């Protein structure tokens, strides 16, 4: 077992991120000292995964205001709001981003009696608390998910909802790590996840380093693997869950859910409660980020299609709640009717 890769660290008053765009070929950590640097890291996906984005943005708020020298507390609070609004533009789909920024802004608006120096300290402590909470949430999700698994089963996952997408354990991968700790042998199938290949470059990498049995398959092999009886369950992460249980996750998740339903394979979604957005009624209202065409036709510096090709590149799709067997949160396992049962978590 190799040393675990740590995606997010706070060191020497700076945010240290593992540059995930370079994996699996290079392991490079980069320090960020400004909100602008954090914004760019989120946008170009040096850090990715809804929980990790939220934690990074929280630190980004502190970095954006730590050098503030204006004279009044009111001006400082306005600057906190400005930095939060700026960081919110980095990526539109992951609700954890907005949840974390709302928490950071509330620190300022709810403590107007504090001095600027005290507010800065409170902002940093809140960012660290969001960081700590995420690690505990991941373990709790894993413990609940493990009750649905058994030794020797085959599990398919899509994209990376692992330790690299969070702060430790991951969400969808948390039961895989805990199963390893129990001495279980799970057989993991990881979709490569076109076009950015997070399943092969990230999920396979971190599971291999942890000594977990993982096999990489292309996205269009999932049906074959399921038809051969090799998959007993599917578990994925998510970037947002609507109030009715519709799930926004990495592009391709919808197709996996349809296949799982056809082959009568349970389809589980690992979802920290901050990703559950009761203000969004259904998946139709979730904004879907579209990314650059180069990710599809020029991924490795060489064109795989005519340069002038029209390209449609949504980063996420929405899986309807009818395809979801259960949503696994740190507070427990939620099953249909989701509209009613998700509310009970709050």
From Swiss-Prot:
Q: Where does the record place a coiled coil?
A: none
Give the molecular function GO annotations: S-methyl-5-thioribose-1-phosphate isomerase activity
The residue range of the signal peptide is none
Biological processes, Gene Ontology terms: L-methionine salvage from methylthioadenosine; pentose catabolic process
| Pathway terms, separated by semicolons | Carbohydrate degradation
Q: Which chain positions carry the site (Transition state stabilizer)?
A: 159
- Transferase among keywords: no
- Give the Enzyme Commission number: 5.3.1.-
Q: Where is the active site?
A: 239 (proton donor)
Give the superkingdom in one word.
Bacteria
Q: Binding residues for substrate, per the UniProt record?
A: 48-50, 91, 198, 249-250
Query: Top-level EC class, please?
Result: isomerase
Question: Which reaction does this enzyme catalyse, per its entry?
Answer: 5-deoxy-alpha-D-ribose 1-phosphate = 5-deoxy-D-ribulose 1-phosphate
Name the keywords, alphabetized. Answer: Carbohydrate metabolism, Isomerase
Q: Which InterPro entries match?
A: Deoxyribose1P_isomerase_DrdI, IF-2B-related, IF-M1Pi, IF_2B-like_C, Initiation_fac_2B_a/b/d, M1Pi_N, NagB/RpiA_transferase-like
The UniProt entry, under NCBIfam families, shows: eIF-2B_rel, PRK05720.1, salvage_mtnA
What family does the Swiss-Prot or TrEMBL record give for this protein? Answer: Belongs to the EIF-2B alpha/beta/delta subunits family. DrdI subfamily.
Function, in words: Catalyzes the isomerization of 5-deoxy-alpha-D-ribose 1-phosphate to 5-deoxy-D-ribulose 1-phosphate, as part of a 5-deoxyribose salvage pathway that recycles this toxic radical SAM enzyme by-product to mainstream metabolites.
State the protein's name: 5-deoxyribose 1-phosphate isomerase
Source organism of this protein record: Bacillus cereus (strain ZK / E33L)
The top of its lineage is: Bacteria, Bacillati, Bacillota, Bacilli, Bacillales
